[in-house]
């Protein structure tokens, strides 16, 4: 029997052979002794083999023997012990229960022995924490141990075993199954913390079981019929994977109640593969089944499968199949795949037009290709020849589509000689609409002064035909950039391509024979007269003969073959001299001087003349403009700009000269007044006109024409070197932001090269 003390003074007496007896409200030591006596009586009954019930009379007799006579005096040890047990039920000053300190007991409790109880004894008892399900230790105090009570493992009292031996064992203060010590303040309350169990691979194991059911056709509740194949499946699994089946089985539609569902237009093997995927999450992608899988996955709305199939097809793109993949993606509504296939077609158009897929395209697809601005082609003649190849492949059927498709060709951008040959071509000679288009292109060439009024989508060059924009050097946060970046109009990206051999500031760059000539400048210590040449095709540098004069802040441009170096500063004074590089003789020669010394000058070529715009002459910035005629070797003053501009960017478009950005401040003023305004010069009227301003002020801005737009690259806004770039459309008079530079820079030289 075990006697266990609860905080509310309740002793629970457990017996192996008989039902449990609960004594409620016992508050003195006699209750413990009574329980011991009762236990001894139960043992004697068990040893004698008696199985009679323990009746109420026996309980009352034992109670009378122990509780009916209070023989002890108030000063006796028992009374002291009773008082100690009574204090367990009293309330302390802090409102809590007082608990007995085992060290204060006067009566050695080691003489009171308890036996273990088996698990059977607890079947009808309240639930409470136990050290073991097989053994419940005794709770016992010893006179030697004042550190608290211990859980003791007591052997059962067997036949022939004396009580003294049991008591001796109980005083050993050892545990056989546990060495844990229970402190005197242990409340023995049940644990109330929550526990959560997470099964590993639960979903995987569940779907494996479902796959097993599918394999053995067990518990299937729907049959999918594709062609002559019947595929059993489980609605729950299909609905959990496919939005198509989820909508079918969870809504009030006819298929929700049918046991067999016909899948019209679905390839049976692809359907079976996707049903297996629903159970396993695995799918084999092969070239011979990828299109069927993708079309079926699109129908069943299996987004992950669609994405995987699209990525697979992206890896298979080739000039021989990109058009087919592009059309297939468009039919299936796979926008990402269509975009990638289209871009691949545009990038490799020269190879695509030599493959069979191109000549087999319908006229509608040919029209979509011809309308694109993104074709990677060297010139417009390439596209016209591709169109003629397509027409001749089935001349009788396709001749009627020729005039409609010819309208997508940018005929005004073809050479006049090419247009003359077209006019006499048998394919166009008898087609009135084709003749109209050819005449329109001829007028564009014959009447250059009317070109602003003849602008149309056919006069807009394709992106790949306009060349590549290069930004060379400039001032950056490290006090001098040597890197060169190029801008691709088709991808709208800047990419580093090369580095100069050394640092140059306030230098000039011009393009001659598709090569970049870097002229003059300063290296931070001295002004330079050196020239070096960069070949973008071979990505190599070569040293050229130097100028006669050291110059920084100069302007450089190519006019009718030779290259001109205009003005600048030689380290001592502002220059009005001009040198000309003869590429045939490979030498520099002086030409007529300008009327005004100019440094940080803007230089551009327009209508066979060289223009020097603004700059500074030492004391202040200039708003004067003069032009050089190479045939007369003279400089002539032109109309002045509305603003003084040093560090101005200039370029030309459609017979007009544009001056962009710059600063206006005297040399002694450290705070420059930066400009965002733009104005253009018409040489026919000798007048400047203001146009839309840039989004921000830009000093030392690089400006260049690319296609039909003017690009303002980098510059300085008074606080930072800019990496932003914006493009001006003269036809709409609007500026738009484009991709930024990789490196912020001011004073970069920006030129266009046709690669």
UniProtKB/Swiss-Prot annotation:
GO molecular function: actin binding; ubiquitin-like ligase-substrate adaptor activity
Keyword Protein transport recorded: no
CDD domains per the UniProt record, alphabetical: BACK_KLHL5, BTB_POZ_KLHL5
Gene3D superfamilies: 1.25.40.420, Kelch-type beta propeller, Potassium Channel Kv1.1, Chain A
Biased composition (Acidic residues): 158-168
Region (Disordered): 152-184
Tissue specificity note: Expressed in adrenal gland, ovary and thyroid gland and less abundantly in lymph node, prostate, spinal cord, testis and trachea.
Cellular compartments per GO CC: Cul3-RING ubiquitin ligase complex; cytoplasm; cytosol; microtubule cytoskeleton; plasma membrane
Protein name, UniProt field: Kelch-like protein 5
